[in-house]
């Protein structure tokens, strides 16, 4: 493929006046022939601090080979990544959600600065997936995202295990039901190699969502990280971006209100992570699509929960792939007349056309038939009430609690709540409240997996509820309300809750309330003394000053 005047790189490379640019590119190995072809950015999120992204260098080489085979010149560059699983429960976790914005900004800046004609983004860990797609939305050049794939399950005492089991084992160990030796054995075997966390946690949730959004080729993200076919997928994606360039298909033609609704439906039917609400709101904003937190509840009301996936179910993402994968999920939802089948994807085919290729493993138990759903409605609900005027998100996949009332145990930060659980201070019937962990108040809206897993590990998963203006990991299960908005630091009612107040979750009525009058809440809020900002400078301080509410996607 020769340079077409439509291609941005024409302005970077052509003519005598661009000799300095060509000279610098030749210094790193590019030839005249290379520079006559379209330049395709390969935005990698490789990092060696975690298994999720550790193998992406291998995949990027195959992506680049595919680009070359189709007549393009790949230029690889890297951005940052922060491991949720490693930083969980520490001050470091505050960097996680903030990294989504930095990932998007950095991918965008490099691509704009070097006038790339197209981009392939490689992602793995939680925030790299939405971060890469947000960048592609902004750039609006022919582009796609490829997910590195799920880790395979580990083995412990004859059972499949994931990182979720290790977090919950910490609670069991504290409760005295797991020995030091057992914890060490589990630690050593839970994560057998590269790939993202294995359940329907945030990474796999967003990988599926973005196939249904159309920005990743259907059925390809689900190929596990160490499956030999993943290299073929990467090569195919390299060729595919050149096809998108030839046809001039761009994200704005793919990502629409209807494709976002398809993505929400995919999250709903697979029991996906609450983080999908934040990330899809953010993507919608990048594309100028009107989307509210209430839209998630409307769609979840009409979508059946079909996938029996961890953390609330029995199976892993690798099991779903073996059962038939996302094309089978798409077929189920099209048969139910839930999806918009006419939405185009990066393959150039519609999601309806992709679903026609679905196959199903005989006797598979991972994805239920429409006639026998796990639940008649989806895995997420949005609650509002005097504690969450702008809303909050509850994951109902994996539990059947529809009503819960109990006295509040209030903590100003995650670490204090974790210590209380470890010390046995949380009892059956309690409602744990963790505040000042929101987007601005944290800052960074930490995930509370350390606390929620400790609660489950202590045997209190069905008898204790939790609410926070922070987030939850996709590995969280039990009655947990996150993203409570407005957040405490912005004067949200959660700041006025006192230990002993009775808090009620009513899933059926979609309500979250504290048994205090509006007059009393208002009086309390006037007397609240918010903690001083924890960060005044650097990226944390800047984020705290500019980030929006969780109900708007926590964007900057």
Please identify what each model-predicted range represents.
Residues 1-54, 59-80, 85-86, 91-96, ...:
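Catalytic or ion-coupling anion/metal-binding cores of large enzyme and transporter domains
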Residues 96-105:
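Glycine-rich, highly charged phosphate/nucleotide-binding loops
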Residues 111-132, 144-147:
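A short, small-residue-rich loop immediately preceding and capping a beta-strand
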């Amino acid at each position: 493929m020769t340079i077409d005047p439509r291609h941005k790189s024409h302005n970077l490379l052509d003519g005598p006046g661009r000799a300095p640019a060509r000279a610098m590119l030749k210094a790193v190995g590019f030839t005249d022939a290379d520079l006559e072809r379209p330049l395709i950015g390969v935005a990698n999120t490789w990092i060696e601090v975690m298994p999720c992204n550790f193998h992406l260098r291998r995949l990027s080489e195959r992506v680049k080979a595919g680009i070359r085979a189709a007549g393009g010149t790949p230029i690889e560059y890297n951005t940052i990544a922060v491991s949720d699983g490693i930083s969980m429960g520490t001050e470091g976790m505050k960097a996680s959600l903030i990294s989504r914005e930095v990932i998007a900004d950095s991918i965008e800046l490099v691509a704009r600065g070097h006038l790339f004609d197209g981009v392939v983004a490689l992602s793995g860990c939680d925030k790299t997936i939405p971060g890469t797609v947000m960048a592609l939305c902004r750039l609006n050049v022919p582009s796609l995202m490829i997910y590195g794939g799920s880790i395979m399950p580990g083995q412990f005492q004859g059972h499949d295990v994931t990182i979720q089991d290790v977090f919950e084992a910490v609670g069991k160990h504290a409760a005295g039901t797991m020995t030091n030796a057992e914890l060490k054995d589990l630690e050593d075997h839970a994560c057998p190699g590269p790939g993202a966390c294995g359940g329907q946690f945030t990474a796999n949730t967003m990988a599926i969502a973005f196939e249904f959004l159309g920005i990743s080729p259907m059925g390809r993200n689900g190929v596990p990280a160490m499956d030999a076919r993943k290299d073929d997928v990467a090569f195919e994606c390299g060729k595919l971006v050149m096809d998108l360039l030839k046809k001039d298909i761009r994200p704005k033609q793919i990502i629409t209100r209807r494709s976002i609704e398809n993505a929400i439906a995919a999250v709903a039917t697979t029991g996906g992570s609450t983080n999908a609400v934040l990330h899809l709101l953010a993507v919608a904003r990048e594309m100028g699509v009107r989307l509210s937190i209430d839209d998630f509840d409307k769609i979840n009301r009409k979508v059946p929960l079909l996938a029996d996936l961890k953390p609330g179910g029995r199976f892993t993402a690798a099991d779903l792939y073996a059962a038939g994968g996302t094309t089978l999920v798409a077929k189920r939802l099209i048969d139910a007349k839930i999806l918009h089948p006419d939405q185009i994807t990066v393959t150039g085919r519609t999601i309806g056309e992709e679903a026609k290729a679905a196959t199903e493993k005989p006797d598979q138990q991972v994805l239920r038939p429409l006639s026998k759903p796990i639940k008649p409605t989806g895995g997420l609900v949005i609650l509002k009430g005097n504690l969450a005027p702008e809303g909050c998100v509850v994951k109902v996949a994996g539990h059947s609690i529809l009503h819960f009332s109990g006295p509040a145990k209030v903590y100003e930060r995650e670490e204090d709540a974790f210590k209380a659980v470890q010390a046995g201070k949380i009892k059956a019937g309690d409602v744990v409240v963790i505040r000042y962990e929101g987007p601005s108040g944290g800052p960074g809206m930490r995930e509370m997996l350390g606390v929620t897993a400790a609660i489950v590990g202590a045997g209190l998963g069905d008898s204790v509820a939790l609410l926070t203006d922070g987030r939850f990991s996709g590995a969280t299960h039990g009655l947990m309300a996150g993203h409570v908005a407005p957040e405490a630091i912005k004067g949200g009612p959660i700041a006025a809750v006192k230990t002993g107040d009775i808090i009620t979750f009513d899933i059926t009525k979609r309500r979250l309330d504290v048994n205090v009058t509006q007059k009393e809440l208002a009086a309390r809020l006037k007397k609240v003394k918010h903690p001083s900002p924890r960060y005044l400078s650097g990226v944390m301080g800047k984020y705290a000053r500019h980030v929006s509410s969780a109900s708007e996607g926590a964007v900057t």
